[in-house]
């Protein structure tokens, strides 16, 4: 899954705006270097000051796929999106556009397909008899769409993006409301698979464990949903089977030791099957701090949100997934923010996916190459004109942020510099960090 470009006719502050996701000036050697680090995954980070339109672009992208089958009037502008997907060992070049209320798809440059809109009340697709284009159903072209779109966003911009419980149609969007994740105190069916995959990976991958620097307990609490039974693996539904792996039992919850299960590949596959089919779900997991086991509701807001986001992604990510993630650094300390891109790379480099991220965080920016970053300013969207990968923070701030003409504290020091005596200047010198102002004070004391 690789997005090449997005054209927006008129939406929010954008009018006749084309956004290119790939620089045409990247050298072959740089491309090869990036592939060593990022593998098959693609990533684009949108950065810029508040109000430059980062969220507008990402939420618009989500709305394209949310309303492609039904409610097309809710796609707020005509558009054209160009991407490629790989399925069944073939690569397909796709152009999807909306023009004059028509949705048209081009597959390998065949522009003869108009996607009919589905009318749920009539239970059928509605043919556009005024059109000369070949009419196809959403089901006909679903193969050429992303397998799913994961959205980790905020309520206002993504209002209505999730599906109602009785929605009839394809559910292409998986939505995680960022505000609500800060309040979650327990796991559930929709993250259980992600928790299991995550704990399995951290159990065996030393690099992953080193990057994350969190000690996870091998124990989880599981809950049995008897009403969800089906024929396959029936012998593994019963709590009697899991008794030999149980550490503690409280009511309908059992604490089990995952290390024993991870060492038995067949048993691990069966547990994964039961979780995928919502027969068992993980109700609680633990990290270890100061030799104590900490439950979800005892974790900090940042720990809880960060882990939940990773579990959500791991539970839902597939080949040809688009992941839209708004400000992933929210509530993270600098160390975790710095490790986020390497962590995603370790998790996803073998998958053909595309991450779309909005962020102001310098340690995310310098984890990426300049052709993976789009800098939004008042009237332009372009790649940074300097190399961002592993550059220092000051270089990023001076090149990406607008220059601040006035700073109250700096003005105060400059005034003191001009009127203070030697002893006062020495006090200033000892209380200011390394900077150009400190250099000026030092010069004054000479």
Show the residue positions of the predicted features:
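Switch/communication elements of ASCE P-loop NTPase nucleotide-binding domains
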Residues: 1-71, 82, 86, 278-413
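P-loop NTPase switch/coupling surface
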Residues: 1-250, 378, 410-446
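Low-complexity, intrinsically disordered regions enriched in charged/polar residues
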Residues: 143, 189, 252-255, 261-269, ...
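Long, low-complexity, polar/charged, intrinsically disordered or flexibly structured peripheral segments
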Residues: 228-299
